[in-house]
């Protein structure tokens, strides 16, 4: 039985990945922080695809709630979680002059600490590798961390966020080493996919045009990358950036 937990699954990329996983035969636990109505819609669409789901509210800046989330998901879906998507994220502007202790803690907490705690919980389930038709180990677990193309193209803006995502990229590789062969760990580094809350349509359209390929990213690009990770048992510790080549800008 395939069971997934997607954090921040009520809206945007999280919703798209949750629905994609349901389409691939996963029962999906839908995590949300405050967007209950959106999460309920995601859950309803998962049920419409014939899969089980559960709505799970948790503040991922709260250590106890974060530690409890994956075990709650496993209990709700009736067995171990085999796919964890660490998608929930805080993305707020700061720089070397404006960053505060609070902005630092919020970004590190949501983008690095919470994924680490959830990864520990995934590991604690005791998943074991199976054997494929070559009698070689095949991982039964997959963790996908939503990172950001900017870790390959650093700028001094969004500093706390960027540092947290750099940590998540390092964590992706080190946990891939630590959890093999039972669990694979990979990252997706999106480029301009959906208009930001504080962006105008014109600014977002220009951001998409400014990539190397002169095009942005669609939700299908993100879910295709997730699908590749599901289907590629020899891939771990990798970052794929569906970003129109934004990370190559100079």
What are these regions (language model features)?
Residues 10-12:
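Conserved glycine-rich cofactor-binding loop
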Residues 24-40:
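Conserved glycine-rich Rossmann-like NAD(P)H-binding loop of the short-chain dehydrogenase/reductase
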Residues 87-92, 245:
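Conserved NAD(P)H cofactor-binding loop of Rossmann-fold oxidoreductase domains
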Residues 95-96, 100-108, 207:
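Substrate-binding pocket helix/loop in short-chain dehydrogenase/reductase
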Residues 130-180, 192:
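Catalytic loop of short-chain dehydrogenase/reductase
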Residues 218-242, 247-248:
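C-terminal substrate-recognition "lid" of short-chain dehydrogenase/reductases
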